[in-house]
Amino acid sequence: MHQMWIPKNSKDLLEFIQSRSPSSCNSIKTFDLSTFYTTIPHSKLKDKSRVLVHLCFMKKNGLRRYKYLVLGRDRSYFVKHYSDSTKKFAETDIFNMLEFLIDNIFAMFDGRVLIPMGTNCAPLLADQFLYSYEADFIQGLLKKNEKKLPRSFNFTFRYIDDILSLNNSRFGDSVDRIYPIELEIKDTTDTDRSTSCVDLHLELDSEGRLGTKRYDKRDDLNFPIVNFQFICSIIPAAPAYGVYIYIYISQMIRYSRACGSYQDFIDRGLQLTTKLLNQGFYLVKLKSSLRICYGRHHDLVDRYEIYMSQQTTDIFHLS
């Protein structure tokens, strides 16, 4: 049964969807844990952290498995008995550090205790807190010998505060059973057949096949966004193009990974290229950067089965 709903990043989520999603989907739902940084009770966060740390050191039968966690130069590892390392930590050491962290990074606003979102540890603390409830929910069902319901969560994912659930149209009915009452969960599904999650737009076709393409919240705004430099600005031209090569390649990689159809990929590439041309970038320089992108990452666009020359023509056809 699938009880780890947390992808490492949006790329991990996309790869999981593309490799393991069901051949036919009958529902697609998304939810948002709104303002959850400001609503996580510190007492519950400490309790859940203590339990998770304890489980890391124990076997399933309740016997101790490890004595220390050792921080090495290039890796961390558990040891069962003794270590002469000066950077070894017992279970109590780790929890005491976590407790100190929780007690000293909070902020007060309007009488509420908040976890500051800008700290490095905030997403990790929130992730482990929510994971503990998700795992407890699935384990609780299995202990009751229920198999059908937990199986319906096999295609459920949560990236920080965004939840995606495939083939489980009744996920919303279980929300109150999974998460603590302090959290506010909103259904953010666009339609019965489409929705957006993280930086992906997902859509079901008439045969239940799941398609993906790149999604950017800024596209929904009714005013233009300036997110790349203008060549006419007071900066040296050579560094500007150097930055562009990096930006262009990285963006095209993201588009090729996210866009299941060639047309969606071209639309995104054309939008980016047009934007940069309008900001003073030279056409010949952009084409050169595109060739570099294809040369290094051709495997990502080979699946479209379109020759590079045709892709270049399609992306630059308005120039």
PLM region descriptions:
Residues M1-I6:
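Glycine/proline-rich, flexible active-site/cofactor-binding loop segments
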Residues N9-I28:
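A short acidic-Thr-Gly-centered motif at the start of a beta-strand
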Residues D12-I17, K143, L149-S152, E182-T189, ...:
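Eukaryotic intrinsically disordered and solvent-exposed regulatory patches
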Residues P22-S174, D192-C197, D205:
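Conserved polymerase palm-domain catalytic core
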Residues L55, V113-D127, Y131, A135, ...:
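Active-site and adjacent loop segments of nucleotide-processing enzymes
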